[in-house]
């Protein structure tokens, strides 16, 4: 496996070269995913096949540089960083103290939203999570394919979690559930949409049966059908 950090570096350095080969008439792709389902690998495969830029954690790095926002702040309110943070903020929303801190997560999200809109204005991209489907639909208003990647076999998720993040075997299932809940809470907080609900996606793809390549091919099939 290529580590998460390595892919962030690869994507940041390859943006310019990949953009040259992109078909500007293609639609963008948004992938939401269960933790450990291989959604990132599916996005990588699509990026290689289509020559389209692929954005995940590197969005935070780019947003921080573009808008002068501390990377730590962006990470605190990112889908990987939230736990009880957004829940606590929601509970304090009607208090005087809460009103002073409530702006922080929305400032972080608005920075990501502005960046996503800038990126798709230059051409179609591939995005992982972070409510980018909401941004593309309500703000950028560009066409896109929206897929949810899941794995019905927990063992598949466990093996990927160990390989990618090095999670200890004794706590791995609890870790997987926590990461899913973080993504669910992030989506609900910023969009009021249900993360993983079939009605919010064009495709629901099971990598335990399709594999990463099969899931990527299914998304390519939808793109081809929309030409």
Regions found by a protein language model. Give the residues of each.
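Short, positively charged and aromatic/hydrophobic N-terminal segments
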Residues: 9-10, 14, 20
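Small-molecule kinase domains that catalyze NTP-dependent phosphoryl transfer to phosphate-bearing small molecules
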Residues: 83-89, 168-213
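Glycine-rich phosphate-binding P-loop
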Residues: 31-44
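ATP-dependent small-molecule kinase phosphotransfer cores
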Residues: 64-124
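Short beta-strand-centered segment that lines the nucleotide-binding/catalytic pocket of NTP-utilizing
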Residues: 53-64
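ATP-dependent NMP and nucleoside kinases share a basic, alpha-helical "lid"
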Residues: 115-165
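Pre-Walker A (Motif I) flank of P-loop NTPase domains
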Residues: 25-29, 123
């Amino acid at each position: 496996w290529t580590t998460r950090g390595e892919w962030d570096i690869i994507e940041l350095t390859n943006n310019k070269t990949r953009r040259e080969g992109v078909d500007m008439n293609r639609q963008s792709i948004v992938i939401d995913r269960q933790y450990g389902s291989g959604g990132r690998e599916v996005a990588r495969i699509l990026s290689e096949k289509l020559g389209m830029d692929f954005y995940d954690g590197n969005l935070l790095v780019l947003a921080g540089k573009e808008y002068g926002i501390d990377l730590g702040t962006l990470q605190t309110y990112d889908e990987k960083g939230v736990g009880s943070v957004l829940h606590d903020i929601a509970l304090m929303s009607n208090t005087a103290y809460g009103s002073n801190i409530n702006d922080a997560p929305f400032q972080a999200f608005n920075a990501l939203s502005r960046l996503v809109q800038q990126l798709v204005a230059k051409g179609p991209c591939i995005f992982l999570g972070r409510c980018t489907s909401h941004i593309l639909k309500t703000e950028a208003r560009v066409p896109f394919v929206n897929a949810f990647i899941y794995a019905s076999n927990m063992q598949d998720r466990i093996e990927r979690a160990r390989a990618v993040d090095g999670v200890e075997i004794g706590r791995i299932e609890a870790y997987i559930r926590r990461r899913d809940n973080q993504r669910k809470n992030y989506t609900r907080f910023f969009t009021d949409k249900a993360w993983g609900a079939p009605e919010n996606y064009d495709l629901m793809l099971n990598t335990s049966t399709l594999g990463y390549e099969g899931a990527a091919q299914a998304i390519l099939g939808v793109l081809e059908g929309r030409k």
